[in-house]
Amino acid sequence: MKKAALFALLLVFMYSCGSSNERGELVGVKSKRKWFAEKPYGMVSIKGGSFTMGKQDEDPLGAMNAPTRTVTVQPFYMDETEITNSEYKQFVYWVRDSIVRTKLAYQAEFASGDEEPDPAGKNKAEGIQLYAFASKDTVNESPYQKYMRENYYEIGEGIDSIKPLNWEEELFWNREDYPDTDYVEVMDSLYIKKDEALNGIRSFNTKLLEYRYFWFDNEEAARTGKNRKDFLKDEVLNVYPDTTVWIKDFNYSYNDPMHQEYFAHKAFEGYPVVGVSWNQARAFCHWRTKNKNSYQRKKKNLGLVPAFRLPTEAEWEYAARGGLDYAKYPWGGPSTTSDRGCFLANFKPVRGDYAADGALYTVEAVSYNPNGFGLYNMAGNVSEWTNTAYNQMSYYMGSTMNPNVENRENRRKIVRGGSWKDVAYFLEVGSRDWEYADTARSYIGFRTVQDYLGTKKQ
């Protein structure tokens, strides 16, 4: 009798544990971790809201492509400044290091020949073997890890990579420090040939700096009934800025120092990166998301962040206005100078006079006063890529809620803000301009945004 009572009590206890004290009520599925919005480093919070988009004043060019209308944009985060040379170098160096480590790992695998694998790491690696693919613990692996190892074979940085790269060992760039001839062979294949070197100084072959990434075409997927794999896009492109834009953009002009030093010299680290196409800017956004989420995964208890991306044209204009509706410029006033006669942005104020504002070319990304949202150089310095495709009629046919005319077939992309070589007209918050997606210029840069998840109340 006692055993029966004890068994019944055990059943009741097990039942109560399985029910999670729901008592049959609809309580919802709650996440284990509470979500809170974290402002990304180097960004400012834009509350979002409605504003009058377009040209409030008569357009002196008669373009008629930016009529006024009221639109609403969601809250988002935006880079405080344009992406700088220093920040873009972090992307370039990551791609460079990935390529070097991949080649070193293959060379280590080739050099090891028929040697028995050493998953436990009992034998101390030397030379090229220090850069071998990171070992997987096949003894203590989970059933899932074993299944993935036996059925998939992938090299890279994904969470399911079977042969991940070894990022722990330091790379040597000084040729005197190369550990062995296998290392020398790999590095030799990555540098320009000796007969192409200037004054015998060989540099890294920037043509090899290619970044591969995948993205999902939501726009096409929502409108066509194909298979999911049809909307997965594979992109491979070179990420190094086109430094020759300083020569190509200006005929019969001496700009050799900018061509040679602007991206390379530390004097320009805090200046906005230029020579980057729309396609390269999107690749940078993908890498920035990947880089942050890789860190989040390593910490395990942190959630993944929303993707970084280029701003839509509407988001860019809303941010540029800084909360001032009907303003002509980001600082609000109708003039490009202060009451003391000082220029408020970096642009070409007079025909032929590029340096009247104190700078011939670009200035540091943190220059002049920020606008009402705390954003620097939303007018002048460099024009900025947006995610939106250019269409002269987009203001007439676009939505009034987060408007964005996105057309993958249209290679013309909106650039905003004007630059150091532009007249004041292009600095106006309502002025529109465009450039081809695969074209880089010495006066076009970019900044990124990230979506704010949830509602940000005023």
Enumerate the language-model features and the residues they cover:
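Functional-site microenvironments in short loops/helix caps that host divalent-cation chemistry
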Residues: 21-25, 45-46, 52, 57, ...
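Post-signal-peptide N-terminal segment of Sec-exported extracytoplasmic proteins
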Residues: 36-66
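Non-catalytic, alpha-helical, charged scaffold/linker segments
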Residues: 103-224
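C-terminal motif of bacterial Sec signal peptides marking the signal peptidase cleavage site
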Residues: 15-16
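N-terminal pre-domain segments of enzymes
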Residues: 21-36
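Short, structured beta-strand segments at or near domain termini in extracellular proteins/domains
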Residues: 442-458
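Short capping motifs at secondary-structure boundaries
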Residues: 76, 83, 92-101, 288-298, ...
